[in-house]
């Protein structure tokens, strides 16, 4: 079990950073916070997410932390670490929440001071909304938590990440390589967002709300998107995402060709396959 005498620091009190702070504080851990926005920091203080926090002159919070959780975009995390990473004390194990690992894990691990360890992880949870004000709405209970260790990580760090996920309330915890993670995320997350965004951009649907059913609402829920974060994640993982888009295009072309050819058998074959795969997914997910 995690040592409750250890001090935790959340860098970036957004949706996920705020949720980590909330859950750790509820579990009895001392949690401090660093955030650019004074208003969001004050919200976290007022609602008991953190014990203390700063927007600047926070070097003391960094040097006191036993564990750090970075709720930053990949580029911002690397930039922050270049400036303040030397302040992290030996023995500190820290992690992130980023949805892309290639291009992030290796450079940050290379910059770690002696005795400091970065174990990357990805909470597969979130909402269409952002900011700490919506952190309490996020549910970790049904979500997956992915740890992406490298050869530079110790068994102790991997175990800490697993125990952190358990304290936060994640139902399923697994490990993948950095490369496996980014390939998988290109399909199960980024492609889904790309499809939802494309569907909303393909047609002026401003007058459709009176006529749409659940299928349109369900499929486009994630099209309400944080444009800065997702643009960065797409670009950082563009090779994997482009490959998934090409594969999706191929499947959509098969369906289109079947329509053009009035090929009912092909349509029914595709529908049966999708139904079977969804049923298998539901069974594993239950």
Language model features with spans:
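Short beta->alpha hinge that forms the Motif I/post-I loop of the SAM-binding pocket
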Residues: 36, 72-73, 97
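Residues at the starts of beta-strands that form the adenosine-phosphate
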Residues: 7, 30-32, 117, 144, ...
